[in-house]
Amino acid sequence: MDYKETLLLPKTTFPMRGNLPQNEPKRFAKWFEKDVYEKMKKSREGKELFTLHDGPPYANGHIHIGHALNKILKDIIVKFNYFEGKAVRFTPGWDCHGLPIEQQVEKKLGTAKKEQLPKTKIRELCREHAAKFVGIQKEEFKNLGVIADWEKPYLTMDYAFEADIYRALCEIAKEGLLVERSKPVYWSWAAKTALAEAEVEYEDKVSPSIYVAFKLDKEAVQKIGKEASIIIWTTTPWTLPANTGIALNPDIEYVLTSDGYVVAADLLDELKEKGIVKGDVEKSISPKDLENLHAINPLNGRRSRIVLGEHVTTESGTGAVHTAPGHGEDDYRVGLKYDLEVLMPVDDAGRYDETIVREKLLPEEFVGMNVFEANDKICELLGDALLKKEDIKHSYPHCWRTHKPIIFRATKQWFIAVDKAPKDLQKTLRQIALEEVEKTTFYPEWGRNRLKSMIENRPDWCISRQRDWGVPIAFFRNKKTGEVIYDEKVLNYIAMIFERMGTDAWYSLSVEELLYPGSGYDPNDLEKVMDILDVWFDSGSTWYAVLKSRRYDAGNYPADLYLEGSDQHRGWFQSSLLVSGAIEKRAPFKAILTHGFTVDEKGEKMSKSKGNVVAPMDVAKKYGVEILRLWVAMSDYQSDLKISDNILKQIAEQYRKLRNTFRFMLANINDLETIQSDFGVLDRWILAKAKSVFEEVEKQFKNYQFAKGFSALNNFIVNEFSGIYLDVCKDRLYCDALNDSHRRASQSAMALIAKSMLGLIAPVLTYTADEIVEHAPSVLRNDAEDIFDFAIEPLPEIQSDFDEVYMIEARSKFNEIVDQLKKKKIIKSSLELVIETTSSKVLALDATEREDWFIVSGVEEEIGSKELGDFKVEGDQFIIKEAILHKCPRCWKYKAKEEGALCERCQKVVDGLEQAGS
C-alpha cells in the first residue's frame, strides 16, 4: 500500500524561485499605484515620529551604484523605524542648480552660442535639463523598491524653494554674518568662477619646483653687513610677478652663508646636498632683524618687503616663503597684517591681463597667456637668480567639474564669516558649529573628529559664483557709495516675487519692478548684484526650505538623521550645519551616518576604462533588486563597499537560503489555525534561542549595524533553526496526526518565529516579505493586506533549560560517525540506528524528542543490538547500534514489529484517518 496520501506533506503557493528580475517591477508598480507611502503615514498616525532628511543628489545623469547604495540604505533605515512602530517621513529631493548642469547645456550649445544668449534663455535650458534628469532618476530610485514621498519631492529649482534659499541668505545677512570683500579664493579658470572648499578635488600634478634668489636691498645689506640674497622656494613660478613680500618665521634661526645666502639653519644641509648653497655658516641671523626691510624681485626689480609669519615651516623649502597676497590664503593674512599691496594680474580665464604692463610686472608678450603655460618663460626671465629647477609630482587642487588645476585669485566675493558672532550672541559661528558637533550622534563615531577638524580649520565660506544657473545673490547696491541695501521690506518683496516667478525674475525684471511700491528708493541710484549662490548653499538650506517651511510633510526639524557618503563631511553636513548654526544657532540634525564608496572586489575605484563598473539597473536585471538591497545590508558600509559579480553570486546564495527557510515554514504551517502556547522541550529551546537572536538583531539594526544584525540572523537560520530545528521537526510535521500536540507545538513555534523574523527582514527584503504575506496562511497574516500592515512582533518570553552546548555537541559527534557509516555503505539513513546512553540530559527528554534530536529510531538506556560506533560528551557514553525492529513503510523509522507493518504511531494515525473517512 502507498502511504503517501496519509502523510501531511508541505503545501504552499509561495514559489521556491523568486524570479526577481521579472516579478519585482510588477509588485513595485502595485505599491506605487496604491501609494503605500501614504498608507504607512496613515497606519502610524499619532506615533513617535522619525525624520530622515534626504541629502539631494544632483539632477544630472543616470543613477550609479553609489546612488543606489545611498538611497537603499536610507530606505532600509526608514522602513526599520516604520516596522518598529514609528511614524516615518522621507521626502526625497534633488539639487538642481550649479555648474555641472550649466556645463551640459554649454556642451550642447557650444561656448560661442551660449555667450550670445541672454541669461534667462540659458537658465531656461538648464531648468529643462535638470527637470529631465529628475524624472529619470526618480523612476530609477523607485525601481530599487525605495518607498518615499515621490509625489511631492523637493527640487531646489522650484520657485518657492528658490525663494526660501534666498530668505535663508537674508536671515544670515540680518545676523551680520554676510560679508563682501576682496580675498584670494579657489578659482576655476576653466569654469570662470570661484569655488568653495567642497568643490575642490586633489589630483596629482607635475609642477616646476624652483629656488630663486632675491637680493637684499642696500638697507638690508647694511643691517647684516654683507651683500646677500634670501632664497625662496615655490612650485608656482607664475605667481612671482605678483610677489610683494617674503615671509620668515619669527621663531626659526636663520643663517648667512659664506657664499651670500640667507636660509633657515635647519634646512642648510638639505640645500647643500641639492647644490643650491655651497658655502658654510658665516653667522646666525635673527628674523626680527630683517622685519620690514626689503629684497628685490629678480623678475621685475620691484621691492619685496620681509615680513614675519607663523605659517612658515622648515618641513621643506628654504624657510623663506614667497608671498603674493592675491594668490594665497596665508599670503593674504600676513599681507593684511603688514599692509602689503595686493596685485592681481590674472583674469577670470586664468590669463595674465593688462595689469602686468600697467604695474610693470612682466613684459607685454605675457598678456593673454595662461598662467600655467607661462611657467617656463618666467623661469627663463629669472636668469641667474634661478638657482635650481626640477619637476615634481605632487597633490594639487583641481576643479571638481572641469578637472583642471585651479588657482588662488583675489577677487571681490561674498563670504559667510565663520569667526563672527551672530547678532546678540557672544559665540562665533565656528564655536556654535563645534558645540553642535559635540551634541550630535555619529555613525560611525570617527565622523565626529573628522567634521570637527574640518570646521576648526576651515576658512570663511565663499558663497558667490560668477555663473548663470543658480539662485542670485539678489541684493541692490548703491551705484555711488557701493553700499548694499539690506532693507527688510525690500528683501521680503524680492522673496515674494521669487516665490511667484522664480529667481529668473532677477534677470527679467528691472530694478524698478523689483522694488516694492513706495519703497522710497530711486531705481536709478541702484544696481543689481549679479553673482549667484554656491550650490552648496542651496543644499545647505534644505532643512530651512523643507523641514522648517512646512510646505512639505517632511517631518521634524531638527531631523533625526542625515545620511550620506563620507565625502559630505566637507560638503552637505558642513554647509547644512553652518546655515542652520547661523540662523537657528543649532544643528539641523540629531545624528549623522556616513557610508564609504563602492569599489570592485579588489578594492579598486570603478571606472569605465577599467571595465569594472557595476550599474544598479544591470544588477536588477540579472539578479534582482532584493540581491542589491541584501548586498547593502550585509556590507560594512563604514568603510568602502566591495561589489562584483562574484560577490553578488554569494549574496544571491544567502538570499536563496533565507527564501527557502520561509518557504519551508509557510508550507508546514498551512493547516495551523491557531497558535498554541503548550510547547515541548525542543520548541521552547528554539523559541528562547530565536528571541535572544532576534533581540540582538534588533539592537544592531537600531544602531544601524545591519551587517552585524544580518550576520547574527543568518548564523541562527543556518545553524540552529534550519540546520537543526526544522530538520528534527520533519517527522512530526509529516507523520504525526493532524492535531497531534507535538506537531501543533512545532507548527506554533514556527509560526511565531516566521512572524517575528518577517518584521526583521521586511526593511531590507521588502519585496520578499510582501510576497510571503501574500502566500501566508491566515494564522500568519491575520488581516494584513500586505507587509505594510505588519510591525516587528517580539517573541513571547519562554523559559528553556535545554543544555544547548551539550546537546549540539552530542548531535555533531553522532553525525560525524553517521557520515563515516554512510561512506562505508554500512547504512543509508540514520533511521537505521539507535543510541544507547546513560546521559541523564538526553534521557530526561521524552522518547519522541530524543529520537527526533538525533533522527534515529530510538534512544534508550539499554538496547541490545550490534554496535557500530561510540562517542563521549562530558564523560557520558553514547553507543551507536543497529536498529533491531523493522522499517515502517510510512515514516521509515525502524520501529515496526514485523516486516511491512506500520509502527505503532503510524498505525494509530492511519486508523484515525480511516475512521474519519468512513
Swiss-Prot record:
GO cellular component: cytosol
Enzyme class: ligase
Motif ('HIGH' region): 57-67
Keywords: Aminoacyl-tRNA synthetase, ATP-binding, Cytoplasm, Ligase, Metal-binding, Nucleotide-binding, Protein biosynthesis, Zinc
Binding site for Zn(2+): C888, C891, C903, C906
GO biological process assignments: isoleucyl-tRNA aminoacylation
GO MF terms held by the record: aminoacyl-tRNA deacylase activity; ATP binding; isoleucine-tRNA ligase activity; tRNA binding; zinc ion binding
Positions with a binding annotation for L-isoleucyl-5'-AMP: E564
Cofactor binding summary note: Binds 1 zinc ion per subunit.
Binding site for ATP: K608
Motif 'KMSKS' region: where in chain: 605-609
Localization per Swiss-Prot or TrEMBL: Cytoplasm
Cofactor: Zn(2+)
Enzyme Commission no: 6.1.1.5
Reaction catalysed by this enzyme: tRNA(Ile) + L-isoleucine + ATP = L-isoleucyl-tRNA(Ile) + AMP + diphosphate
Signal peptide stretch: none
A Pfam family it matches: tRNA-synt_1
CDD domains in the cross-refs: Anticodon_Ia_Ile_BEm, IleRS_core
InterPro entries from the UniProt entry: aa-tRNA-synth_I_CS, aa-tRNA-synth_Ia, Anticodon_Ile_BEm, Ile-tRNA-ligase, Ile-tRNA-ligase_type1, Ile-tRNA_ligase, M/V/L/I-tRNA-synth_anticd-bd, Rossmann-like_a/b/a_fold
Domain notes: IleRS has two distinct active sites: one for aminoacylation and one for editing. The misactivated valine is translocated from the active site to the editing site, which sterically excludes the correctly activated isoleucine. The single editing site contains two valyl binding pockets, one specific for each substrate (Val-AMP or Val-tRNA(Ile)).
PANTHER family: ISOLEUCINE--TRNA LIGASE, MITOCHONDRIAL, SOLEUCYL-TRNA SYNTHETASE
Family: Belongs to the class-I aminoacyl-tRNA synthetase family. IleS type 1 subfamily.
Function field: Catalyzes the attachment of isoleucine to tRNA(Ile). As IleRS can inadvertently accommodate and process structurally similar amino acids such as valine, to avoid such errors it has two additional distinct tRNA(Ile)-dependent editing activities. One activity is designated as 'pretransfer' editing and involves the hydrolysis of activated Val-AMP. The other activity is designated 'posttransfer' editing and involves deacylation of mischarged Val-tRNA(Ile).
Subunit structure: Monomer.
Entry protein name: Isoleucine--tRNA ligase
Organism: Nitratiruptor sp. (strain SB155-2)
